[in-house]
């Protein structure tokens, strides 16, 4: 199986003798502001609750999410991270085929494979990677399938308007459409793009979201889905009990009620993604894609350099980027970087400029820096 995540910092540092406290992790697209103070406070105040079993139905959190998304509690399922839900959906609904528009989040393919469902991959050959593209009509040839889409798409960052998603769902009534909106909270005008409020009203739409990326606590694992009541009931028959622990529920409830933090995050990311993108455009030999969210996909145009080699050289400067060569539809000429703090973003720009300005092939200069097999460890 492929790993669909970056951010394996501790594992890499433990195995190869690097200091995790000195690593700047651009491989995982987590909120640069970190975890909200209200979450830290709530967890500290309610820590003693771990002596009791958690609420297996996550009732308080489901109610809060239902209010936030203008639906009923019966339309919501809470998961131990969005990944639990990605694996649950095909296992419970058992489509005849899975369909993926590549490149996209690697866990989708693994989720289908885990349920022994054959996957049809449609490679997006448009250079700008639009989600709704000329290959979409090919879905008509696949009966009773399930389609996983990511909006904004990971790793390309492409954002698709709500009306285009709704049209796709209505045009494919016999195909379950699953939309991963893990990064939608970072979008300032998300009402133009999100279909989460439409999900309870449609028979073939499921929307999945993560709480850990936006609120900066991926170690806790917390996500949720919204769909119509009939679909939720089918999914719940296959969902394992007790998967969401007490601390995660406390953190999630505190987080989604912190509207000031959410507004500050969107403003901060908006400024910093522009700063990082503008800086990347000045570096020769690379082409950054216009960002919509808190990460940027970069195309390497210098044929002497590869993403694996650049990654290895940057690790010498304690900078970890996401090598995108293991995404279907991408190759060794792509990497992804998260938007972080101004100081960290500037350090990345300086280091990357130095790498790209070096007239020596990076493939040659990487020798004796980091063992070649390290690149495989950090491709998640």
Identify the role of each PLM range.
Residues 269-270, 283-317, 339, 371-372, ...:
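Conserved PLP-binding catalytic core of the aspartate aminotransferase-like
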Residues 54, 66-88:
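Short loop-beta-helix segment that forms the pyridoxal 5′-phosphate
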Residues 163, 316-317, 326-380:
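PLP-dependent enzyme catalytic core of the Aspartate aminotransferase-like
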Residues 126-187:
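Active-site phosphate-binding strand-loop segment of PLP-dependent enzymes
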Residues 35-36, 57, 204-282, 286-289:
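PLP-dependent aminotransferase class I/II
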Residues 1-52, 142-143:
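N-terminal "arm"/small-domain region of PLP-dependent enzymes with the aminotransferase-like
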Residues 91-149:
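PLP-dependent aminotransferase-like
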Residues 277-302, 324-333, 360:
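Conserved small-domain helix->loop->beta segment predominantly found in fold-type I
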């Amino acid at each position: 199986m492929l790993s669909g995540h970056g951010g394996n910092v501790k594992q890499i540092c433990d195995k190869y003798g690097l200091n995790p406290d000195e690593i700047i992790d651009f491989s995982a697209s987590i909120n640069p502001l970190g975890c909200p103070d209200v979450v830290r406070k709530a967890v500290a105040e309610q820590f003693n609750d771990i002596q009791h079993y958690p609420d297996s139905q996550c009732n308080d959190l489901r109610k809060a999410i239902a209010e936030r998304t203008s639906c009923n509690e019966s339309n919501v399922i809470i998961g131990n991270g969005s990944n639990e839900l990605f694996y649950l959906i095909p296992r419970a609904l058992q489509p005849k085929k899975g369909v993926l528009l590549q490149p996209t989040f690697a866990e989708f393919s693994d989720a289908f494979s885990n349920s022994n469902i054959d996957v049809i991959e449609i490679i997006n050959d448009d250079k700008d990677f639009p989600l709704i593209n000329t290959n979409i009509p090919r879905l008509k040839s696949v009966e009773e399938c399930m389609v996983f889409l990511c909006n904004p798409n990971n790793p390309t960052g492409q954002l698709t308007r709500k009306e285009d998603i709704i049209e796709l769902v209505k045009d494919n009534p016999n195909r379950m459409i699953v939309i991963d909106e893990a990064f939608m909270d970072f979008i300032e005008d998300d009402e133009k793009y999100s279909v989460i409020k439409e999900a309870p009203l449609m028979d073939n739409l499921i929307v999945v979201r993560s709480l850990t990326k936006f609120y900066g606590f991926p170690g806790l694992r917390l996500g949720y889905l919204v769909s119509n009541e009939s679909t939720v009931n089918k999914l719940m028959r296959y969902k394992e009990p007790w998967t969401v622990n007490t601390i995660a529920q406390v953190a999630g409830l505190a987080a989604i009620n912190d509207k000031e933090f959410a507004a500050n995050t969107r403003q901060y990311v908006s400024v910093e993604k522009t700063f990082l993108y503008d800086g990347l455009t000045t570096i020769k030999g690379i082409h950054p894609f216009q960002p919509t969210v808190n990460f940027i996909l970069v195309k390497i145009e210098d044929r002497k350099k590869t993403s694996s080699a650049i990654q290895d050289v940057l690790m010498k400067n304690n900078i970890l980027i996401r090598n995108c060569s293991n995404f279907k539809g991408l190759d060794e000429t792509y990497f992804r970087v998260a938007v972080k703090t101004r100081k960290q973003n500037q350090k990345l720009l300086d280091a990357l400029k130095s790498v790209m300005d070096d007239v020596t092939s990076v493939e040659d200069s990487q020798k004796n820096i980091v063992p070649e097999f390290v690149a495989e460890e950090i491709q998640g």
